[in-house]
C-alpha cells in the first residue's frame, strides 16, 4: 500500500504496540478504517453485534454488510482497503477481565455508557 501521501501526517511505525478497537459501530468502524488506510498493520477488533440496514448511513459499511457480524464485515472491508493489514476479530462482548489481558493502545468505542464506564475503569486499573 502506498503511504507516501499520509506518512508525513502519521507514521504507522509509531504504533509498535498492540492496537485494540472495542466497538466497531459508528465511531469504531471509521477509526478502524482510518488506521488501516494509514498503514497500521495489526489491529484487534472487538464487537458482538451485527450490522443492520439502518446502520449504513452512519457507519463505515456498505449494504453488503447488513446482517453480518460486525467484526466479520470489517475484516472483509479492511482487506479491500489494505490487503497487507491483519485484522483480528473477537466476536464477543468485552469484559473487564478481557481488558486486563490487553496491552498497547485501546480505543473504547462502545455505545452503552454503563459498559463504557466499566471498561474505562478496568483500563485505568490496568495501566
What are the residue ranges of the model-derived segments?
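Short amphipathic alpha-helical segments
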Residues: 32-34, 57-58, 118-121
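A short helix-to-beta-strand connector/capping loop
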Residues: 82-88
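Conserved SAM/SAH-binding loop
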Residues: 90-97
